[in-house]
Amino acid sequence: FERQQVAEMLWLLNAGNDDGMKEYLQNAASENRAWDGVFRDVILARGDDNDASKGAAGFYKQRIGDLDRLTNDVSVRFFGINVSCAQCHDHPEVSSWKQDHYYGMKSFFSRTFDNGGFVVEREYGFVKFKTTAGEEKHADLMFLSGEVIKEPEAPEPDNKAKEAEKKRLEQFKKDKKPVPAPEFSRREQLIHAGLKPGADGFFSRAIINRLWYRFLGYGLVMPLDQLHGANRPSHPELMEWLARDLVSHEYNLRRTIRGLVLSAAYARGSQWGDSQRPSASYFAVAQPRPLTPNQYGSALIFASIDPENFRPHTIP
């Protein structure tokens, strides 16, 4: 179970073959670390050599140089919302998604950068964008729910202060140490906003939808990255109940997975009678699915490997 869970989480987070991320997720699966804890570790990315969250910074490695990709990936993978359509204009089909939402999410990462392999955050920096009318705006620090987070004044430093900051960062880089987090961290504010009760439940519903898709072959909301009011779940009461249950049991994914695989919906066969096969969204019959590339490759490795060399908590 743990091996497969790590593989699925690597796919979900699109972490590729980053060794640090693999090790982090292996430990998280072994300890049954809560999903909100994984979210915190990944977003903060502050683990050092003696920290259990070491390796979680791997999520940023392929993204830290591209804030637009980082913004949308966090939104898609943790909140089930693809906000990229609201980058250049308000969403054409979802009236609730505005440019303010996209750039509000981007603002959580606008002060984040790499310093000697460490993911660090400075105390200043704002996001500007132009509306379709040509108006230039400063983006508010705004979560997907529309909540605007108040923050202390953070004026742009003068050239002398920037030069001093540059020297300070170089020293941390030479010492191979992380830069201390700012007193007001925008990434910390994202965690608070995302996990806040009543924040439209994006965080809990997104992982429930992905787990349902993983085991049942079709999400309660499809596509998986379109979890918004204009795209209602096929079974809204079930979605809300599962999300509440997950939160009330401290984001214990193993417990939720156990419930799903013991359910009547999961146990259904894939054969149907002579009548028309029902839509996949009814979950009245199992959906035949090919193996994923990862499953197929893993199966070949498992079938051919020497059992004596098969070690627990290792992904070939």
Regions found by a protein language model. Give the residues of each.
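Primarily short, surface-exposed interaction patches in extracytoplasmic proteins
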Residues: F1-H313
